[in-house]
Amino acid sequence: MSDRPTARRWGKCGPLCTRENIMVAFKGVWTQAFWKAVTAEFLAMLIFVLLSLGSTINWGGTEKPLPVDMVLISLCFGLSIATMVQCFGHISGGHINPAVTVAMVCTRKISIAKSVFYIAAQCLGAIIGAGILYLVTPPSVVGGLGVTMVHGNLTAGHGLLVELIITFQLVFTIFASCDSKRTDVTGSIALAIGFSVAIGHLFAINYTGASMNPARSFGPAVIMGNWENHWIYWVGPIIGAVLAGGLYEYVFCPDVEFKRRFKEAFSKAAQQTKGSYMEVEDNRSQVETDDLILKPGVVHVIDVDRGEEKKGKDQSGEVLSSV
């Protein structure tokens, strides 16, 4: 077979797919600090899932289940994430959530290459954390192992919207609390994020299980093999996170450099639009002038002897207008 089709296929992207360009795209990946950050995300997610999912175990078993303690679960999730952010924030940024990582990519805070490793580490940590919890919990009380599920009286669309909303408030809290441009933040950033997670749980546990974190739902789903409506816990949180990050970073509190670039782009576009508008107006004015010059007037029939216009009928019987 000829190598020509292969050459054609790679001809245009060949210069971009060189070893040097690939190394530039993954710049910073091959450093010790990078792998420390990835390991931190893995370990933080493992501990977070293990501790927080443990609060969902119903120790009454299937025969005599205890009432669900929403406050206990909410506080455990909130304080767990606050602790992990405080411990690992200076190492990896303390994302501990694929939705947060995607929002950071969309706001140009981390590279795509770094985000791929972060999300992989987070998902792997969630699986291992859920697996450890499954191993140390008596089979009679394992139950669903904290698998997130949409309430039976709600549709998938309702669940998607709830996850979008609670993740939006979480990620908006993260961006607002971690904004380096602010000088009024004096409290604990980790605690603010933890409270945001707790509030989301207090509101949405009965609706969707209050995930706000695709990896948190992914871990127990893998261990228990339960994938019912699992896509909701990826699509909803990611959309909510991207909306929150984009609104905060580009609308409410844009940085000085972004505002300068936006003004330049807007001014340039306005000038181009104004020039096109003036050109169209000039053409229209010329056409209207030509119409005034070339348009024939109305012929009037006037009786000079009587000094008045004739009103009557011509030979064809049509009325001659004096207007």
UniProtKB/Swiss-Prot annotation:
GO terms, biological process: cellular response to type II interferon; cerebrospinal fluid circulation; intracellular water homeostasis; multicellular organismal-level water homeostasis; protein homotetramerization; renal water homeostasis; water transport
Segments spanning the bilayer are: 37-57, 70-89, 116-136, 156-176, 185-205, 232-252
Gene Ontology molecular functions:
identical protein binding; water channel activity
Question: Which Gene3D superfamilies does the UniProt entry name for this protein?
Answer: Glycerol uptake facilitator protein (1.20.1080.10)
Name the chemical reaction catalysed here. H2O(in) = H2O(out)
**Matching Pfam families:** MIP
Under the heading CDD domains, the entry gives: MIP
Q: Where in the cell is it found?
A: Cell membrane; Basolateral cell membrane; Endosome membrane; Cell membrane, Sarcolemma
Q: Which residues carry this modification: Phosphothreonine?
A: 289
Q: What is its main location?
A: membrane
Superkingdom of origin organism:
Eukaryota
Which residues are modified by glycosylation?
153, 206
**Result of mutating residue 215 to T?**
In MLC4; likely pathogenic; loss of function in cell volume regulation; does not localize to the cell membrane
- How is the protein altered post-translationally, as described in the entry? Phosphorylation by PKC at Ser-180 reduces conductance by 50%. Phosphorylation by PKG at Ser-111 in response to glutamate increases conductance by 40%. Isoform 2: Palmitoylated on its N-terminal region. Isoform 1: Not palmitoylated.
Q: Which residues point to the Cytoplasmic side?
A: 1-36, 90-93, 102-115, 177-184, 253-323
What keywords does the record list, in alphabetical order?
A: Cell membrane, Cell projection, Disease variant, Endosome, Glycoprotein, Lipoprotein, Membrane, Palmitate, Phosphoprotein, Repeat, Transmembrane, Transmembrane helix, Transport
Provide a GO CC annotation, any one: endosome membrane
Q: Where is this motif: NPA 1?
A: 97-99
Kindly provide the intramembrane ranges recorded for this chain: 94-101, 209-222
- Name positions with the PTM Phosphoserine: 111, 180, 276, 285, 321
Q: What does this protein do?
A: Forms a water-specific channel. Plays an important role in brain water homeostasis. It is involved in glymphatic solute transport and is required for a normal rate of water exchange across the blood brain interface. Required for normal levels of cerebrospinal fluid influx into the brain cortex and parenchyma along paravascular spaces that surround penetrating arteries, and for normal drainage of interstitial fluid along paravenous drainage pathways.
What is said about the domains?
Aquaporins contain two tandem repeats each containing three membrane-spanning domains and a pore-forming loop with the signature motif Asn-Pro-Ala (NPA).
Q: What is this protein called?
A: Aquaporin-4
| Organism field | Homo sapiens (Human)
Specify the taxonomic lineage. Answer: Eukaryota, Metazoa, Chordata, Craniata, Vertebrata
